[in-house]
Amino acid sequence: MESRINWGIIGCGNVAEVKSGPAFYKTENSTLVAVMRRNEDKVIDFANRHGVANWTTNAEALIQNDLINAVYIATPPSSHLQYALRAINVGKNVYLEKPMVLNNHEANILVEAVKRSNVKVTVAHYRRELPVYLKIKELLDSNVIGNVISAEIQIKQTRNTNLIAKTEVNWRTIPEISGGGYFHDIAPHQIDLMCHYFGEVENIKKGSCKENQVSHQDVSGEVLFKNGVQFSGTWNFNALEDKDECTIKGERGSISFSFYTSTITVSKNGLIESYHYENPEHVQQPMIEKTVGYFLAHNSNPCSVEEAAMVTHIMDVFCGT
């Protein structure tokens, strides 16, 4: 039984810089041993600033490195499946960025590969472990607003929004790399939370997404969960103004929150109660701590490939693909 997780990172870009990278060497029983990026100057710079002894420009070399026993894949989605399968093939556990893969077909391939192996794979739907979303789950589980009837997400973003992470090349709008567009960048977190809160899916309906729409600028759909909760979501990335809202309605009240602030509003019996939480410096650290615990057999998987595959399936249906 391993007593420590020695990580290698494939893809040392913006996400790994602050959101996730430092958490691998700040988490107990976890060390960042090696990093990979295709640009030599940039990978050396990353390694030097984060105190990482080993670097490479070759992903296969990192995967084969005997010093590491787990791989964090933080590349654009088009290479997620390729690198995950390679890591699984050599017996390395994997922490895989969202979206897990490009589409439902790739998701099925990965799910089957994990089933056939002894490797552990966690998907980085890290919002599950942030304080604000843990509080929402606590409120729902304690039946504060009674039995939940419905949940609605409304996301509107202008072309110049600052809610989307910026990169040198805007690969998020290139379907062959991202899977579709901005919807594929931000919706996985949001849809995953709905599945995390409400459980198994009964039925999925596509909404207004235009057929053959390349980058999915305007998407909507509905999900009926087996517990009776009706979810509806709309995403518009060419809106006149920004909107970011999720409202969960129950028999005795409602819970409202935003995905880009950390305030929860509970309305019940004519009274309003608010909760505010600060995110940790490295927002993925709570999820990475749970992932390390899972790899060391201390706790269950914080987000399985099967759970992430359902998110991918919902997105494919919403987009008509």
Curated annotation (Swiss-Prot):
It is an enzyme of class 1 (oxidoreductase). InterPro entries: Gfo/Idh/MocA-like_OxRdtase_N (IPR000683), Gfo/Idh/MocA_oxidrdct_glycsds (IPR050463), GFO_IDH_MocA-like_dom (IPR055170), NAD(P)-bd_dom_sf (IPR036291). GO terms for cellular component: cell surface. One of its GO terms (molecular function) is nucleotide binding. Keywords: Oxidoreductase. Its main location: other. It is found in: Cell surface. Its EC number is 1.-.-.-. Induction: By ulvan. It comes from the Bacteria. Signal peptide: none annotated. Oxidoreductase that may be involved in ulvan degradation. Ulvan is the main polysaccharide component of the Ulvales (green seaweed) cell wall. It is composed of disaccharide building blocks comprising 3-sulfated rhamnose (Rha3S) linked to D-glucuronic acid (GlcA), L-iduronic acid (IduA), or D-xylose (Xyl). Belongs to the Gfo/Idh/MocA family. This is Oxidoreductase P35. It comes from Formosa agariphila (strain DSM 15362 / KCTC 12365 / LMG 23005 / KMM 3901 / M-2Alg 35-1).
